[in-house]
Amino acid sequence: MLAKRIVPCLDVKDGKVVKGVQFRNHAIVGDIVPLAARYAIEGADELVFYDISASAHGKVIDKSWVSRVAEQIDIPFCVAGGIKTLAQAREKLAFGADKISINSPALTDPDLISRLQDEFGRQCIVIGIDSFFDAASNSYKVKQFTGDEAATKDTQWYTQDWVEEVQKRGCGEIVLNVMNQDGVRGGYDIKQLSMVRSICDVPLIASGGAGTMAHFKDVFEQAKVDAALAASVFHKGIIDIGELKQYLHANNIAIRL
């Protein structure tokens, strides 16, 4: 059995790591490189960096901190934020990123997924999906430009349809960001993740809702995800990554210690 992965997420805005609640009211939590180094030392399997305002404001991730992170850590990391062209993706990979994640640009130009996959191979192409449960219609819908509350907009896509579409176009991995759960630390959305797992043939990363070690165990056991992403519980020291991995191992979850 492949080991499950623990993935700290670092949302970046104006060169600092920030964290919000339900994608709003972001506050600064630290500097990029020291936090990345800390998580690598603590035993993270991988890191994800989102430049949360890049797509909404027509910008691209700042390559300077990408190279600094690559110099400081020896675990894989993925970067996202405003990547719309092969040249932009190539630059981030050249500066040391192991994977490229695209979210809003793929919704604007779905064929971008295929072009990236053809050029770099699907193993390094991650699709981020910002999924919102709409109670009025009792459905999961995909949102775009979520890094800026004023720019956030609805799309034509239901989550399950977009999950199937991005796989057809060649993505190698999916991160499902459950917007309703984000930052509230009430647990992952097992129901939605299980639904996506049933139609997802590529690695699936759960994002949004981690508050306790048991939440990680539950999402691995019940939703069968390949990795669990979290931010605030790590940033605020609520959960230590090493202790989390020992807990998961003790509960018979395959994990790298």
Curated annotation (Swiss-Prot):
Pfam families: His_biosynth (PF00977). InterPro entries: Aldolase_TIM, His_biosynth, HisF, IGPS_HisA/HisF, RibuloseP-bd_barrel. Its EC number is 4.3.2.10. GO terms for biological process: L-histidine biosynthetic process. The active site is at 11, 130. It catalyses: 5-[(5-phospho-1-deoxy-D-ribulos-1-ylimino)methylamino]-1-(5-phospho-beta-D-ribosyl)imidazole-4-carboxamide + L-glutamine = D-erythro-1-(imidazol-4-yl)glycerol 3-phosphate + 5-amino-1-(5-phospho-beta-D-ribosyl)imidazole-4-carboxamide + L-glutamate + H(+). The keyword Cytoplasm applies. Keywords: Amino-acid biosynthesis, Cytoplasm, Histidine biosynthesis, Lyase. NCBIfam families: hisF. PANTHER family: IMIDAZOLE GLYCEROL PHOSPHATE SYNTHASE HISHF, IMIDAZOLE GLYCEROL PHOSPHATE SYNTHASE SUBUNIT HISF/H IGP SYNTHASE SUBUNIT HISF/H. IGPS catalyzes the conversion of PRFAR and glutamine to IGP, AICAR and glutamate. The HisF subunit catalyzes the cyclization activity that produces IGP and AICAR from PRFAR using the ammonia provided by the HisH subunit. Heterodimer of HisH and HisF. This is Imidazole glycerol phosphate synthase subunit HisF. The gene is hisF.
